[in-house]
C-alpha cells in the first residue's frame, strides 16, 4: 500500500479519537481485537474512558513509524507517541493492523513506553 494512504488512514483514527465519537473510533478496530488482556468489548470500555478524559482535546501523533510485512496476510505495525493538547509527553503506542474484507483494522494495541 501507498505510504500516503496509510498515513491518511492513521490520521482518520487520530481524528476519530479526538472527536470523542466512540462509534467512529471503534470502527477502526477488528471484532477479533485483543490487547492481550482485553477482548473487543472490554477494549471498547477502555477507549470510552480514554476518550472521555480527552474531552475533545486535539491529539498529536509524534514519531510515527509504519512497518509493513506479509505473514498469512498483509500486516502493519504502527508505532507513535500520542500527545494530547496541553501536554508535553504522552504514551508510546504500538498498533497492529490487518486486512479484513479489504479494509485495514486494528487487531492489537498496547502502550510500550
Language-model-detected regions and their locations in the chain:
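Short, low-complexity N-terminal intrinsically disordered segments enriched in polar/charged residues
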Residues: 1-22, 27
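Surface-exposed, charged secondary-structure patches
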Residues: 5, 45-94, 112
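Short, solvent-exposed loop/turn elements at domain surfaces
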Residues: 24, 36-37, 87
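Generic alpha-helical secondary-structure signal
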Residues: 27-28, 46
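A short gly/proline-enriched turn/hairpin at secondary-structure junctions
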Residues: 28-41
Amino acid at each position: 500500500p501507498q505510504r500516503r494512504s496509510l498515513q491518511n488512514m492513521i490520521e482518520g483514527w487520530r481524528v476519530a479519537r479526538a472527536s470523542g465519537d466512540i462509534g467512529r473510533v471503534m470502527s477502526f478496530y477488528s471484532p477479533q481485537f485483543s490487547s492481550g488482556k482485553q477482548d473487543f468489548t472490554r477494549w471498547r470500555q477502555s477507549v470510552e474512558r480514554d476518550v472521555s478524559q480527552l474531552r475533545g482535546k486535539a491529539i498529536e501523533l509524534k514519531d510515527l513509524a509504519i512497518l509493513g510485512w506479509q505473514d498469512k496476510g498483509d500486516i502493519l505495525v504502527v508505532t507513535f507517541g500520542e500527545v494530547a493538547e496541553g501536554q508535553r509527553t504522552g504514551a508510546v503506542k504500538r498498533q497492529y493492523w490487518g486486512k479484513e474484507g479489504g479494509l485495514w483494522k486494528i487487531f492489537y494495541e498496547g502502550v510500550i513506553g
